[in-house]
Amino acid sequence: MQENLDKRLEALRTEISLAARSLFDLDKKQKELQVLEEESSEENFWQDSVHAGKISEQIVSLRRQIQEYQELKSKIDAIEFFLEDADALEDPAICEDLEKEFLFCEKKLAVWETQRLLSGEADKNSCFLTINAGAGGTESCDWVEMLFRMYSRWATKHQWALEVVDRLDGEVVGIKHVTVKFSGMYAYGYAKAERGVHRLVRISPFDSNGKRHTSFASVDVFPEIDDQIKIEIRPNDLRIDTFRSSGAGGQHVNVTESAVRITHLPSGVVVSCQNERSQIQNRESCMKMLQAKLYQQVLQERLEKQSLDRKDKKEIAWGSQIRNYVFQPYTLVKDVRTGHETGNVQAMLDGELLDEFIKAYLAEFGEVS
């Protein structure tokens, strides 16, 4: 047992040393934090409140990441301390605690290893995720709500802030369409793996004959863009429509036309927002989403060009079916791109296993930094 634990400790020591230099890049993060903290201490820092808010978010994120590294290193030091005490290893309770610490450290290092595959220019950004009901009527609307719950729980697990930007409920149950914003580091890098069509097979609870139904929902993901990225949008290229909100919003719902829909005529991209209380706020949110969607198109064009330049790379078809969720006659979730699968459908829909599917996708299609 001692020999096995010593080997695991040595592996952790090696991996955290590598993480400090490359995976985590501790020196770079500390320098970035120092620069941002110096900027935030300037006298006129809050004159541009939007920019100041973004800088403050970056500072909080960097501090949290550096703290995570320091805590992990402390845990490894503590493990080493206990391993030097042979008598302590005779205590089952201490051995159980050591195993928990080992698993925690190994899991955290695995997360950093995954983030090494997130080297795209927008991978660190927050993102918008949209789910639309496909063929299947009421069943598909229920499927959208199930996916929305899965992604919400998954985002909470990653400690990302969640904001529903736009939502249209189904006529009977569920959701026809929903757009949610995930705010946090690497939100886009992880969520982009979910872009595509998701297929559900189950015995419908809405069918009195108990027949098996197949439903579809499409997921789209696009990154929030920062101030450094400029997307030119000409006012003449926009058609702006207003309508009454059909969702939450207090006394203003269905009273004033506060909801906004913007169509970008050259590209055909359509965005809408009804979450805010005023038309002005909804319009601002729409413009942010439109910029993000147009930026996503730029990224996709670059990716397609890279695929042509690299014949050895597997094709990534964004609009295709990516995953099957089967409840009957057996239970199985299978990603058709990677072959990764699980028989625990409920844990998947609880957001507990989604990272495993995303990691498999990144291992096959991600770019190593």
UniProtKB/Swiss-Prot annotation:
Signal sequence segment: none
N5-methylglutamine sites (modified residues): Q251
Keywords assigned by UniProt, alphabetized: Cytoplasm, Methylation, Protein biosynthesis
Subcellular location: Cytoplasm
Predominant location category: cytoplasm
GO terms of molecular function: translation release factor activity, codon specific
Entry annotated with the keyword tRNA processing: no
A biological process from GO: viral translational frameshifting
Cytoplasm keyword on record: yes
Modification after translation (UniProt): Methylated by PrmC. Methylation increases the termination efficiency of RF2.
Chain ranges passing through the membrane: none
InterPro entries membership: PCRF, Pep_chain_release_fac_I, Pep_chain_release_fac_I_sf, PrfB
One matching Pfam family: RF-1
Family annotation (PROSITE patterns): RF_PROK_I (PS00745)
Functional summary from the UniProt entry: Peptide chain release factor 2 directs the termination of translation in response to the peptide chain termination codons UGA and UAA.
Matching PANTHER family: CLASS I PEPTIDE CHAIN RELEASE FACTOR (PTHR43116:SF3), PEPTIDE CHAIN RELEASE FACTOR 2 (PTHR43116)
Family listed: Belongs to the prokaryotic/mitochondrial release factor family.
Miscellaneous information on this protein: The gene for this protein contains a UGA in-frame termination codon after Leu-23; a naturally occurring frameshift enables complete translation of RF-2. This provides a mechanism for the protein to regulate its own production.
Name assigned to this protein: Peptide chain release factor 2
